[in-house]
A protein has these predicted regions:
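Flavin-dependent oxidoreductase catalytic core characteristic
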Residues: 1-242
Length: 242
């Protein structure tokens, strides 16, 4: 919201003047960014390795809307042993939607990122370079988010588990929506790759390998017009509950 509220919003709606402090404070509740990224990177070897013979087998998780006690989420222990956690193969989530142009391009970016990590991993010096690790972690996080989105999409589109009436209602989700979402992912991955390429501590091998991630999303003019028209049709339709 902070990024999209124009100056006129502050002039016409005094609520924003009061809300800006809370809007910008919300990310702080999630913790310090560089600490979280450092923790995320501990998962990276096991996560990427799951597609290369190191996969663990876990049961599929369906949509949960039952009245169960999830209080364990608020009683998390210390962040120890993260690098030893195993993951299932992430490829099936992407294979299901591989026919969508931008999902396919994003998958190419993942392969290029994996090649970068395997052939030119962070050096001992870079392990202490927060600027380098921040960008590397952002690249990795995009992959994980992409998998989660596609897994939820498959539950909705294939199994009809759309969670109607919830904040995660996916009743109207279509494959064109997914393709448009991943157009953003492709662009963001490319942006982060360029940043990593320009890092002062990046080796020549890393700078060359990371350029393999730079891709351009495929935007169909007719599909884009349909998407924008749909987005604009939602303007003014939201009604706050009294």
């Amino acid at each position: 919201m902070w990024d999209v509220i124009a100056a006129r919003g502050f002039e016409r709606d005094t609520y924003f003047s009061r809300a800006v402090t809370e809007i910008r404070a919300l990310p702080k509740l999630e913790g310090t960014v560089h600490v979280n990224i450092a923790l995320v990177l501990k998962f990276m070897p096991s996560y990427l390795g799951a597609a290369h013979g190191g996969a663990q087998h876990y049961p599929e998780i369906p949509v949960r809307q039952d009245d169960d006690d999830d209080s364990y989420l608020f009683h998390q222990g210390p962040a120890k042993g993260l690098s030893s956690i195993g993951f299932a193969d992430w490829r099936p989530a992407f294979d299901r939607f591989a026919h969508l142009p931008n999902v396919a391009i994003f998958r190419e970016q993942i392969d290029a990122f994996t090649e970068l990590v395997l052939t030119a991993p962070p050096t001992d010096t870079q392990q202490k370079d927060l600027d380098y690790l921040q960008v590397l972690g952002q690249l990795f996080a995009q992959i994980v988010y992409g998998q989660l989105i596609l897994e939820s999409a498959a539950l909705a589109i294939d199994n009809g588990e759309t969670r109607p009436g919830s904040v995660s209602d996916l009743s109207d989700l279509t494959e064109p929506h997914l393709d448009r979402i991943f157009a953003v992912f492709v662009r963001d991955m490319a942006d982060q790759a360029v940043q990593l390429h320009g890092q002062a501590s990046a080796t020549e091998e890393q700078s060359a390998a990371v350029l393999g991630i730079v891709r351009k999303p495929r935007i169909n003019a007719e599909a884009e017009h349909t998407f924008v028209t749909e987005v604009l049709s939602y303007s003014g339709t939201y009604e706050m509950k009294s």
